[in-house]
From Swiss-Prot:
One of its GO terms (cellular component) is cytoplasm. PANTHER family: RIBOSOMAL PROTEIN S19P FAMILY MEMBER, SMALL RIBOSOMAL SUBUNIT PROTEIN US19M. Belongs to the universal ribosomal protein uS19 family. Gene3D superfamilies: 30s Ribosomal Protein S19, Chain A. One of its GO terms (biological process) is ribosomal small subunit assembly. InterPro entries: Ribosomal_uS19, Ribosomal_uS19_bac-type, Ribosomal_uS19_CS, Ribosomal_uS19_SF. One of its GO terms (molecular function) is structural constituent of ribosome. The keyword Secreted does not apply. This is Small ribosomal subunit protein uS19. It comes from Chlorobium luteolum (strain DSM 273 / BCRC 81028 / 2530).
Amino acid sequence: MPRSLKKGPFIDIKLEKRILDMNSRSEKKVLKTWSRSTMISPDFVGHTIAVHNGKTHVPVYVSDNMVGHKLGEFAPTRTFRGHAGGKAEKGGSAPKRK
């Protein structure tokens, strides 16, 4: 369920303050954040934000079409290592019956 319109988007206050401060100084550097639920605003465009995925910080370069999404959408938390490789590793299917 989406957030109520009367509440407005959630943006971490400290992160927004750091971004606006960097915009005023026209500075670009990587910002670390643990706030995956922060919605991306137009002020964030052009910055690289390192979003925590539970283990490391994943660098996310914010572009125009990311506005309105949340930071956590661009830092996957799970790694897919493949399914069990029983038959696929052997290179063939089961032998045919006669």
